[in-house]
Amino acid sequence: MKKTIVFKCGGSVIRELSADFFQNVKELMQSGWNIAVVHGGGPDISKMLKTLQIETEFVDGQRKTTKPVLETAEMVLSGTINKFFVTELAKNGLKAAGISGKDGGLLQASYLNQDKYGEVGEIQKTDPSIIHALMKEGIIPVIAPLSMTSDFETLNVNADAAASAVASALHADKLLFVTDVEGIMDGESRLDTLTPQEIQALIDDGVISGGMIPKVNSALSALSEDVEEVMIVNGKGAFFTDQAFQGTKIVKEKESVS
């Protein structure tokens, strides 16, 4: 049975992905891995909202998703960003299909808190059949984080949560959070494998700080019964060299050495 990797690419790193990154994806495809991509698009959404002069408000650091904001987000996520990624994969000889969580009932959600956050969903159910159909044909699904309710309302969902849900539904062997750093660093050296307990200690000690904390917390929350290994890797360089993944691996517990 083929192994599966899900990549989560944040909106801030998508346009900075290196040629080495795409070459590595190609190598993995050629060596028999199934691949799916979930992407964000925050910076591009903000830019488009400004261009269209759509007013926004923030609640607890999160942009409230009003109907006009949602329409803009869907336009950017399913349109500009999604097709940009598909095109970059095509340039590297890889077949990809751009979809969103609405397609084929992939991500089914309910309102997180409509009064507070607006059109934002919490994923309740996944149906990965559309992903399996694409993978069977050797096509990489590139997924925008949008979902649908049981009443067919469109909701925006957190891209990290979407990636975690997709990885869980696929029983993925690896979920890779693609960032602009080599992994979790302690000074100049990269920490290769960490458990949740070790990560908390590093946060308490200030080794993990600033913008790295939300990246690490996203990776931690993705660990589940169905996703046993999460990695933080660098999209600005090679993440797969000498037949090994380069980055920080986050596991529930380390294997005991007997």
UniProtKB/Swiss-Prot annotation:
| Pathway named in the protein's UniProt entry | Amino-acid biosynthesis; L-arginine biosynthesis; N(2)-acetyl-L-ornithine from L-glutamate: step 2/4
Q: What molecular function terms (GO) are annotated for this protein?
A: acetylglutamate kinase activity; ATP binding
Q: Where in the cell is it found?
A: Cytoplasm
Which CDD domains does this one have?
A: AAK_NAGK-like
For this entry, list what GO says about its biological process.
Answer: arginine biosynthetic process via ornithine; L-arginine biosynthetic process
One of the record's GO cellular component terms: cytoplasm
Principal location class: cytoplasm
Q: What is its EC number?
A: 2.7.2.8
- Return the annotated site residues (Transition state stabilizer): 8, 215
Q: Which residues bind substrate?
A: 41-42, 63, 156
Instruction: Tell me which InterPro entries the record gives.
Output: AceGlu_kinase-like_sf (IPR036393), AcgluKinase_fam (IPR004662), ArgB (IPR037528), Asp/Glu/Uridylate_kinase (IPR001048), Glu/AcGlu_kinase (IPR001057)
Catalytic activity entry: N-acetyl-L-glutamate + ATP = N-acetyl-L-glutamyl 5-phosphate + ADP
Q: Does the keyword Cytoplasm apply?
A: yes
EC category name: transferase
Q: State the Pfam families in the record.
A: AA_kinase
Q: Which UniProt keywords apply?
A: Amino-acid biosynthesis, Arginine biosynthesis, ATP-binding, Cytoplasm, Kinase, Nucleotide-binding, Transferase
UniProt xrefs under HAMAP family: ArgB
> Which function does this protein serve?
Catalyzes the ATP-dependent phosphorylation of N-acetyl-L-glutamate.
Which family, according to UniProt?
A: Belongs to the acetylglutamate kinase family. ArgB subfamily.
Q: What is this protein called?
A: Acetylglutamate kinase
| Organism for this UniProt entry | Bacillus velezensis (strain DSM 23117 / BGSC 10A6 / LMG 26770 / FZB42)
What is this protein's gene name?
argB
